[in-house]
Amino acid sequence: MKKEEYLEKVALANLWMRAYYEKDEPLASDEEYDALIRELRVFEEQNKDEISKDSPTQKIAPTIQSEFKKIAHLKRMWSMEDVFDESELRAWAKRAKCEKNFFIEPKFDGASLNLLYENGKLVSGATRGDGEVGEDITLNVFEIENIPKNIAYKERIEIRGEVVILKDDFEKINEKRALLNQSLFANPRNAASGSLRQLDTSITKERNLKFYPWGVGENTLNFTKHSEVMQFIRELGFLKDDFVRLCANLDEVLKAYDELLALREKKPMMMDGMVVRVDDLALCEELGYTVKFPKFMAAFKFPALEKTTRLIGVNLQVGRSGVITPVAVLEPVNLDGVVVKSATLHNFDEIARLDVKINDFVSVIRSGDVIPKITKVFKERREGLEMEISRPKLCPTCQSELLDEGTLIKCQNIDCEDRLVNSIIHFVSKKCLNIDGLGENIVELLYKHKKITTLESIFHLKFNDFEGLEGFKEKKINNLLNAIEQARECELFRFITALGIEHIGEVAAKKLSLSFGKEWYKQSFEAYANLEGFGEQMALSLCEFTRVNRTRIDEFYKLLNLKIEKLEIKSDGVIFGKTFVITGTLSRPRDEFKALIEKLGGKVSGSVSKKTDYVLFGEEAGSKLSKAKELEVKCIDESAFNELVKE
């Protein structure tokens, strides 16, 4: 890299940094920004005499805004050096002159906060700011429920940590903002930062923020280990994450990293890495600091789940109900080991809300098995080559005229090939008839060769239907035919789910099965509407579907031997007739607790109200627990629940 190119990249990095930290309006993904900073560092290490004083590597990002007073930290708040792989970790440890006794914990992706306590009372809270001076957000800090306002330590002390928003709460916040036509937060970190810097403290309160301490600033503690400091801080009443440990050497650090990375999707809040620091405080003092980082700690970053790429086109997909779904075609990008080439755009209202165009740079996020989605459009990076995404008039599959209902655009042709194929794929899927071996590609192949053309035709398949088809040999054919035969004996609720009735999912199908048995499709509007959890919309959908398809369901009954699940309910226990809400992370899947509660005659609701009898909560319980406490609903942990069900 030449000096001129280096200075251009310094200017670009500063532009991205100001947009991110000062305006909460990022112009690039974290991965893009990190890569740019690493390029600058490589040049600076090789050209120490040409380092620009304006380089972001030489300063802490400013976040001071005019709406809040400035407040000086008693001791500087440092950022951390990033390392991205084993070789970089070992290089950092070598520079730190330490290869044993490391303290490690998750690096939560939130907003840093500095709390000052005097005489055991919380007196102020401030953002990191430029490291020396932050924003005074004390009034908002007092609205964060899990921050102790009084502690059993009378000396002056700064306690530092990360403010996060749980993933579930983040989704609810964005759902609410969408209804109000407000811009959506790109990620939970931006939401946490924005929530802390509200002029209206009631908004901060309703966001259900969580604070996790990771260190101290000014203090008079006499501990010799950082682990001892953190144990003391948590004993004062602060939250502690389950994954905090001491590692004897770097091999243990690497093992812990792999373990934590495997927990990434299960954690209720976002993590972007693992903090690794020297545990010996005397050695930390000896090592000191660079111009920007402590030498005794580093952030061992996870692979990015969010990256920037370009939207190069839009494909239209036709669902089994005829709804047209636009899918973004992307320049391929590697997200956590998976090459992502497309992302959902949901519907054309979402396209309008995002104001996304073909050739835009966009930020794409992938989480677990969730379909990748676009979280942000970088409009400031437009080059004049962008093209509008127009609403379709004709079905991309059958070319029939589409019905435009505003949010939804539908193909009304019931013989549309994509509608039929997707209906069959849904019918045989795991949560429906669960026909092993009859996956999406096989369904498409069989439909293409006219071996299956309706849902019913699946059960008329014979051995010779598969002969000559690519990939089908005797064993595979017999296995598939056996799986189809086994599916004839499926539970009634699975069959109802498989029919793909609008608004009727697995839970509603179970309710219909248990309430009406095989006569479920012969009921009145009132009978449907009176079912718990059902409403007018679901009842209307059922009435319309069963009116049109009653004869067809009768024919299915001749093909299938459907089983009705019977729930044996214990009616004399303390749980009988009680309503539970489950929240947080428990030792076993929620479905197991739900099944036990229902077996004992209780029921499980998805929301807390005055009619709720118990809230069963686990680790990182969210807003449901807070609401339960406000309504004075009895809250029990897993241990108390186990005692309750023993009675």
From Swiss-Prot:
Which cofactors go with this protein? Mg(2+); Mn(2+)
Catalytic activities: NAD(+) + (deoxyribonucleotide)n-3'-hydroxyl + 5'-phospho-(deoxyribonucleotide)m = (deoxyribonucleotide)n+m + AMP + beta-nicotinamide D-nucleotide
Secretion signal: which residues? Answer: none
In this protein, the active site sits at 107 (n6-amp-lysine intermediate)
Sorted alphabetically, the Gene Ontology cellular component annotations on this record are: cytosol
Q: Which SMART domains match?
A: BRCT, LIGANc
Can you name one GO molecular function term for this protein? metal ion binding
Query: EC no.?
Result: 6.5.1.2
InterPro entries tied to this protein? BRCT_dom (IPR001357), BRCT_dom_sf (IPR036420), DNA_ligase (IPR001679), DNA_ligase_AS (IPR018239), DNA_ligase_CS (IPR033136), DNAligase_adenylation (IPR013839), DNAligase_N (IPR013840), NA-bd_OB-fold (IPR012340)
A Pfam family for this UniProt protein?
BRCT
Q: Does the keyword Iron apply?
A: no
Per UniProt, Zn(2+) binds at 395, 398, 411, 416
Binding of NAD(+) occurs at 30-34, 79-80, 105, 128, 162, 301
Keyword annotations for this protein?
A: DNA damage, DNA repair, DNA replication, Ligase, Magnesium, Manganese, Metal-binding, NAD, Zinc
Its Gene Ontology biological processes? DNA repair; DNA replication
Domain BRCT: where? 570-647
Family the entry assigns = Belongs to the NAD-dependent DNA ligase family. LigA subfamily.
Q: What role does this protein play?
A: DNA ligase that catalyzes the formation of phosphodiester linkages between 5'-phosphoryl and 3'-hydroxyl groups in double-stranded DNA using NAD as a coenzyme and as the energy source for the reaction. It is essential for DNA replication and repair of damaged DNA.
- Which protein, by its recorded name, is this? DNA ligase
Taxonomically, what lineage is the organism? Answer: Bacteria, Pseudomonadati, Campylobacterota, Epsilonproteobacteria, Campylobacterales
